[in-house]
């Protein structure tokens, strides 16, 4: 899968939970352009997961079984929850 339309990816970042909207949109705005092509694909795939699952992963430290999604979750958490 190739990332052809960045604005469509951005639109897909919109979630039904405010907390996820803030975390995922901020990550997209700050970090998406710096991801490798593989990481971009992992990120887009992660967006297909439902909100409750992503919320558990990002807020309650649930570990995804999928290693690719786990990597993106780790990047999002590092970006979102760093206080530097």
From Swiss-Prot:
InterPro entries: SDH, SDH_sf, SdhE_FAD_assembly_factor. Transmembrane segments: none annotated. It is found in: Cytoplasm. Signal peptide: none annotated. One of its GO terms (cellular component) is cytoplasm. It comes from the Bacteria. Keywords: Chaperone, Cytoplasm. Pfam families: Sdh5. GO terms for biological process: succinate metabolic process. An FAD assembly protein, which accelerates covalent attachment of the cofactor into other proteins. Plays an essential role in the assembly of succinate dehydrogenase (SDH, respiratory complex II), an enzyme complex that is a component of both the tricarboxylic acid cycle and the electron transport chain, and which couples the oxidation of succinate to fumarate with the reduction of ubiquinone (coenzyme Q) to ubiquinol. Required for flavinylation (covalent attachment of FAD) of the flavoprotein subunit SdhA of SDH and other flavinylated proteins as well. Belongs to the SdhE FAD assembly factor family. PANTHER family: FAD ASSEMBLY FACTOR SDHE (PTHR39585:SF1). This is FAD assembly factor SdhE. The lineage of its organism: Bacteria, Pseudomonadati, Pseudomonadota, Gammaproteobacteria, Enterobacterales. The gene is sdhE.
